[in-house]
């Protein structure tokens, strides 16, 4: 999603080791530069490794973890610090998982698509166990911070979701939240976020202070003892005091903003300011219904609010009761804060009229490499 052109490749953006697919998912291709290697599949995919394609053997998630573990081991053996960012293609459609994982769920009565969806998740769980086992084996836990998180709320493929058949005893589950991926409601943006650092933070705690991805960098900086960050470039705040136990809560005065931010090339972003957005603080979620926008039946099923709404997330985490008429002043403050945010963000929305790339870089590089020697087999590291 960050761009498939060469300047945007991870090995050109500060990463020493990059083992990636292209586009937004394995095998994807769109009418722009966003495209993976031609004909790629979840099993035995062609992967771009530090700027060159290699042919792998195995399931994509297993391969990503194996590659990362091999690199981590090399850093451990060299007594060097490391930062590993492992982003899996799964769980993402098409929903295909290793046979043993799929069978577990078909045996429980799930349809093939659902079984693939849940099988992908189980496979990630297995690989997380493999990662944690190796960190323990290599005695790295005392010096390593481990974070597990997702990038958006509940997605497709689950039991009972948008017409998917319901396996007996396994109805649709979204932790009671309203909305799915693509929605500005809680269920569209709330994700799991777990942290571990042995010997430094007390384990087994649930911290209920609302935080966001923008808080991760300030927290890392605080851990490293960096007190001053570039002004006007780094948003967010450190939640290190919560991790250390120095504080039980942080100020609840700030707002977090969400916008779906999807419009066609050449469209005026200001026309979408009041569509598919939300404002959140510790207690309330204000959800914009989308002025002058029709909400489709599919969007309603996804939890998209047809009108502006305010919810007390402490008393009503499932967003069942719109209290905007009882607290119009709260809604107005949140709407005003969002308006201020948009005015600050709009000048940063550059290249809105830039034409789509006429080429697909991964396709071009793949053809060039096939012409000049072919695609070698990837040699998996010994762990």
Regions from the language model: what does each represent?
Residues 2-82, 88-106, 115-118, 272, ...:
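Formylglycine-dependent
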Residues 5-14, 94-97, 110, 133-200, ...:
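Histidine-centered active-site microenvironments of extracellular/periplasmic hydrolases
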Residues 17, 21-29, 156-184, 201-205, ...:
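C-terminal cap/loop subdomain of S1 sulfatases and analogous C-terminal strand-loop tails that border
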Residues 48-53, 109-114, 148, 174-178, ...:
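Flexible glycine/proline-enriched surface loops and loop-helix/loop-strand junctions
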Residues 216, 302-309, 313-383:
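Long, internal low-complexity/basic segments
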């Amino acid at each position: 999603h960050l761009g498939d052109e060469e300047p945007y490749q991870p090995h050109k953006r500060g990463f020493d080791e990059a083992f990636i697919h292209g586009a937004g998912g394995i095998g994807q291709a769109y009418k722009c530069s966003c495209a993976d290697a031609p004909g790629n599949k979840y099993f035995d995919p062609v992967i771009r490794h530090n700027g060159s394609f290699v042919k792998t053997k195995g399931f994509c998630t297993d391969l990503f973890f194996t590659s990362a573990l091999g690199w981590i081991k090399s850093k451990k053996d060299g007594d060097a610090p490391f930062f590993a960012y492992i982003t899996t293609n799964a769980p993402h459609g098409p929903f295909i998982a290793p046979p043993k994982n799929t069978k577990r769920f078909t045996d429980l009565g799930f349809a093939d698509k659902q079984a693939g969806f849940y099988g992908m998740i189980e496979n990630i769980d297995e690989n997380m166990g493999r990662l944690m086992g190796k960190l323990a084996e290599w005695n790295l836990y005392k010096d390593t911070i481990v974070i597990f998180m997702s990038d958006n709320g509940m997605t497709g493929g689950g039991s009972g979701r948008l017409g998917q058949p319901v396996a007996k005893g396994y109805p649709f589950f979204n932790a009671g939240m309203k909305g799915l991926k693509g929605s500005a409601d809680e269920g569209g943006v709330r994700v799991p976020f777990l942290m571990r650092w042995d010997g430094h933070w007390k384990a087994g705690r649930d911290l209920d202070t609302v935080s966001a991805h923008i808080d991760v960098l300030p927290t890392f900086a605080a851990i490293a003892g960096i007190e001053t960050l570039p002004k006007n470039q780094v948003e967010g705040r450190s939640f290190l005091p919560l991790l250390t136990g120095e504080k039980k809560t942080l100020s609840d005065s700030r707002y977090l903003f969400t916008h779906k931010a999807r419009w066609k090339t050449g469209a005026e972003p200001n026309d979408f300011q009041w569509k598919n957005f939300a404002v959140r603080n510790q207690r309330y979620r204000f959800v914009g219904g989308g002025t002058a926008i029709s909400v489709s039946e599919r969007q309603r099923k996804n939890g998209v609010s047809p009108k502006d709404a305010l919810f007390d997330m402490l008393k009503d985490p499932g967003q069942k009761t719109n209290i905007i008429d009882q607290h119009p002043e709260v809604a107005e403050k949140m709407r005003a804060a969002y308006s201020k945010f948009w005015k600050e963000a709009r000048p940063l929305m550059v290249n809105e009229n830039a034409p789509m790339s006429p080429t697909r870089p991964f396709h071009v590089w793949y053809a060039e490499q096939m012409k000049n020697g072919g695609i070698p087999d990837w040699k998996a590291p010994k762990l």
